[in-house]
From Swiss-Prot:
Belongs to the NAGSA dehydrogenase family. Type 1 subfamily. LysY sub-subfamily. It is found in: Cytoplasm. Involved in both the arginine and lysine biosynthetic pathways. The active site is at 153. It comes from Caldivirga maquilingensis (strain ATCC 700844 / DSM 13496 / JCM 10307 / IC-167). This is Putative [LysW]-L-2-aminoadipate/[LysW]-L-glutamate phosphate reductase. GO terms for biological process: arginine biosynthetic process via ornithine; L-arginine biosynthetic process; lysine biosynthetic process via aminoadipic acid. NADP(+) binds at residues 10-13, 34-36, 321. Gene3D superfamilies: Dihydrodipicolinate Reductase, domain 2, NAD(P)-binding Rossmann-like Domain. The keyword NADP applies. It catalyses: [amino-group carrier protein]-C-terminal-N-(1-carboxy-5-oxopentan-1-yl)-L-glutamine + phosphate + NADP(+) = [amino-group carrier protein]-C-terminal-N-(1-carboxy-5-phosphooxy-5-oxopentan-1-yl)-L-glutamine + NADPH + H(+); [amino-group carrier protein]-C-terminal-gamma-(L-glutamyl-5-semialdehyde)-L-glutamate + phosphate + NADP(+) = [amino-group carrier protein]-C-terminal-gamma-(5-phospho-L-glutamyl)-L-glutamate + NADPH + H(+).
Amino acid sequence: MRRACIIGASGVIGGELLRLLLGHNNVEVVCATSRRFAGEFIYRVHPNLRGFINLKFTQPSIDAVLKSESDVVFLALPHGESVKWVPKLVESGLLAIDLSADFRLKNPDDYVKWYHWPQPHPYPDLLKAAAYGLPELHRDEIKATKVIAVPGCMATASIVSLAPLVKGHLINNDFIVVDAKIASSGAGAEGTVLDYHWHRTHVVRPYQPVGHRHTAEIEQELSLLAGSQVNVAFTPHAVDMVRGIFVTGHARLSGSISEPDLWRAYRGMYGNERFIRIVKDKAGLAHYPSVKYVVGTNMVDVGFELDQRLNRVVVFSAIDNLIRGAAGQAIQSFNINQGFPEDEGLRFITPYPV
């Protein structure tokens, strides 16, 4: 049994971590912190957990974490905050699983460029040692590390959809277009006025159409697979959903590529993966991925279509942004690191109909 602490447990992702870890056979949640709600019962902030947990939130501090005798610490903090915690946790011998961006990018200077930090990352050695927590690409690194950087939600969906094509050198890497649609829960517990219901309902609204910070992760990971620079034009949109991300990507083919070539690439990379399904079906109700069939799960559904007229490929992916895009992927990586079954605590099927 592993003892777990969640730093920043009162937010949307913190609540999802609590919910999932309470169903994990090898985890006991012993500590959950919140500056705002310290001293309050957890179920009063996360009403869905009433009857499942009687802990109270505590003030966040290293001393509180050490006093709890935790083995693993999940950090669900705003960007720029985890970097203050992780070095101390690692020094204390704990496994740190960070759901912010603070350890995702390998180049220290990228934090100035993409996150507007006043200086490069202050812990370049720890940054290098951290594993990018996308299990299907970095399983070996995740097993061996003490710091897991959980990928961004839209980055996860984008990378998984394109990775087989990039790895197989089936597309041109100089200009890939990625369009993402994300639900309102992606804004977290403290969004802007534009995340209020009357602004968000019945809307498809682009935001940060150029220079979105998830671009850095997508390019980093795809470039590693390609062995050369991959350039991605990434544009997200806010849409009228509570949960979910849907990605559509477009890329030029690198040569005369057939549909069987595409199938071989996707099956070769994902055919044995527990949490990735290839959805491309001429029969049935679901011809391509859909958010409806992944919500509430750790699945990534991917699909593709060949456009022979323009010599391009269109790719699709769908995930639950709070599970596969955050808490679920964190737990999947935790399971790998600790030698537990990869799907422990994550064996969910989407309710249907919803």
